[in-house]
Amino acid sequence: MQIRVPQRNRGRTFPHRSSHRRTPIHILEFLAAQPLLTLALILAVGLLIGKIRFFGISLGAAAVLFVALALSTVDPALQLPPLVYQLGLAMFVYAIGLSAGSEFFAEFRHRGWKLTLFMIGLLMLMMAVAYGIIKLFGLDEIIGAGMFAGALSSTPGMAAMVEMLEGIDDSVASEPVVGYSLAYPGAVIGSILVAAIGAKLMKVNHAADAAEEGLVSDPLEWTGVRIGPGINGTIAQLPTLAGEEIIATRVVHSKTFHSLAAPNDRLHEGMVLVIHGTPDALERAIAKVGKQQDVPIEDTDLVYSRFTVSSKAVVGRKISDLDTVRSGFIISRLRRGDADVVPEPDDVLHYSDRVRVIAPANRMSEVRRFLGDSERSLADVDLMPFAFGLVIGLAIGVIPIPLPGGNTLSLGFGGGPIVAGLILGALNRTGPIHWQMPYHASRTISTFGLAIFLAGVGTSAGVGFRQALTDPASLTVIAGGFIVTISSALVCALVCMPLFKLKWDEAMGVAAGCTTNPAIISYLNGQTGTELATRGYATVYPTAMIGKIIASQMLLLALIA
């Protein structure tokens, strides 16, 4: 006796079981009907595998992509709604833009514009390489154009080609997706292989490179200095006079009487100050402005303490605008993330910054209230600015940009949010709106956005990858895309290191920025433990994102012309 299962299992038969036992349902079919459970499972398994080290290398969040790809290859019905990866990518790139905004525009004025021009040239070169591969191997033109987008991880570029083809021949509008799906996994694997193998062969010292670039500071110390003859100016001008990143915090009048070093106080011969900086900076500064002086600080009425910045009245403002001396304290050290740095007057305070302050003991409670120092306030994150910023970014993403021939393109859900994030991150605040978020909240949102993006895009690529297992022609598309990916990463290393004097990690960050692939930058950050790769990534990401949308459509037009 057999029981037929209705509706979606119609036509399939199962052996009769006892009435008290439920009819078994295939686990993959069950997951296909439960996308939320599927998403959670992919995230859990992927993040678990990402912690495992293979030959000293761990994939981190990138493992989520491969778990999603594996599941959807076994059963193409395992698809997550497009909204999942669209929202994930938008959250990730917007958070990246917020954190990198100030540095991006500051860097652009120095060498950022050079890297922007390099990225434009690189995309043109890769477009030519892809064109040659398609013609040499006789690949289908439309699938080949999709291969180019997949090899450089350009989901917006692929979407732009689909939209363009819908206006030309709707019957082939889905073919770029096939090429994209086949090439996309190789884009992740290829870039990670170049970064990992290159770092091993070149014996890259990640921490030393980051320190040389000023991204990892030596521990800060303090010492006393007696100002020598011929040193004229104010305390605020002392770093300039010394030519070093130092800060004066105390004027020493006697063993028991110290006062705060006000910026407008005049320097004079014999004046004794307490200054802070790295050991090397202190040594060089003292040699220029005077001589070292032993200063006991235990028996004075000035004390020091660390507070966390959480006050809305302080966040987003420059230290110089706070007039801290009038409020009874001086900020001697600024800790953001894992690094202590000497604060500068133009530094803008962010949520969750840790500051070391010096103040009279009887005013320390007042200083605490001024800065906030409330973990509860930081945990109560105001998501309104983040949501409003996403709205601005997504709105920018849908604005049509006209092209010759009557075609249009848009920045999409990946390009628009990063443009908005960079601008708003550089602004810090607009009136009462604080665009920046607490450090931990920003990292959590960006990591979660990255993970759900990888889960969503991984399941969408499974159909094409499954075809490759049975169609030899698909293997040619995979190989062609892999060549484009490897070529772009190698060009970044071979050009950026000698021409722009970039370290290996930053050059690989530029390569990751070329692919605009969050999985690659996640891997690089996990392996290096520094911000070098992120700096390179953020510098070229906007140009690469926009450039690939244009390049993908230009390649398609060149192939079908």
UniProtKB/Swiss-Prot annotation:
Record's keyword annotation contains Transport: yes
Keywords attached to this entry: Cell membrane, Membrane, Transmembrane, Transmembrane helix, Transport
Species whose genome carries this gene: Corynebacterium diphtheriae (strain ATCC 700971 / NCTC 13129 / Biotype gravis)
Membrane topology term: Multi-pass membrane protein
GO molecular function, a single term: monoatomic cation transmembrane transporter activity
Compartments, record wording: Cell membrane
GO biological process: carbohydrate metabolic process; potassium ion transport
Family: Belongs to the AAE transporter (TC 2.A.81) family.
PANTHER family tied to this protein: K(+)_H(+) ANTIPORTER SUBUNIT KHTT (PTHR30445), TRANSPORT PROTEIN YIDE-RELATED (PTHR30445:SF3)
Main localization, broad class: membrane
Cross-referenced InterPro entries: AAE_transporter (IPR050144), RCK_C (IPR006037), RCK_C_sf (IPR036721), Transaldolase_AS (IPR018225), YidE_YbjL (IPR006512)
Keyword Cell membrane: yes
Protein name: Uncharacterized transporter DIP0570
GO terms under cellular component: plasma membrane
Record-annotated membrane-spanning stretches: 27-49, 54-71, 83-105, 115-137, 142-162, 177-199, 383-405, 409-428, 441-463, 478-500
Disulfide partners: none
Residue span, RCK C-terminal domain: 292-373
